[in-house]
Amino acid sequence: MTTPHLDRLRAHCQRLRLHRLEAELPNLLEQAAKREMSYSDWLDELLSLEIQSKAEKHLAMRTAMARFPFQKTLDAFDFKFQPSIDPKVIRELATGRYLESGDNVLLLGPPGVGKTHLAVALGLKACEQGIRVLFTTAAGLIATLGKAFAENRLDERLKILAQPQLLIIDEIGYIPIDRQGANLFFQLISRRYERGSILVTSNQSLGAWGEVFGDAVLATAILDRLLHHSITVNIRGDSYRLREKLKAGLLKSKHVPEPATE
């Protein structure tokens, strides 16, 4: 193919924003000639390549906007180390069907058992399914809401936090929440009630949330909305972080839980 012709095709790709095709056009033309592809087969391959490229870009954008603290997958989770977790329940959550019905998810258990890992992994799965996700810690969320309240922008911030189809709130119960923080948290839960899913992790049992929020009445109102349509996963097991410290010799113990092997 002549250079002017190739340049014209590239210009067309630029105008149509077919950036992947523009970059790979010479190779695609060469492969089409070598394989003696029909026009329809070649066009199908071109469009499939561009669709894949755009899907990858959109996934990368959704993942970046979710603000995950790290990226971990379900495949990397050691279910055999945490036998209290039913893998079928987590795999079902990974399908995203709970998002279609607007259900909430509560991951409860002591520190280090993998709650945040599961929350991030489920969030990544949701991103792969085209879902808009936002990850935040409870402390970060309360601080954000408190700042918005002080600046008279609370309603604006609540509208923003109500937009993601999945809001992940990590580490409820790790630090105490004052009365104002509890009230702001309740307003967010109420704003999202039956509008979008919330996934929370907590190291406290639900019965202790009155102490976490410093107000039993507010805690009950929050739980009433979270539990109305929800799936609760209770994790009872050893800490992954403690296991790694034991393996590294930083701690000593008579019983060191070993990771399961195939």
Question: What does each model-identified segment do?
Answer:
Residues 10, 14, 18-70:
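Interdomain "pre-motor" coupling segment immediately N-terminal to P-loop NTPase/helicase cores
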Residues 12-19, 28-31, 46-49, 53, ...:
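Conserved, well-folded catalytic cores of nucleic-acid-processing
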Residues 85-163, 212:
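Conserved P-loop
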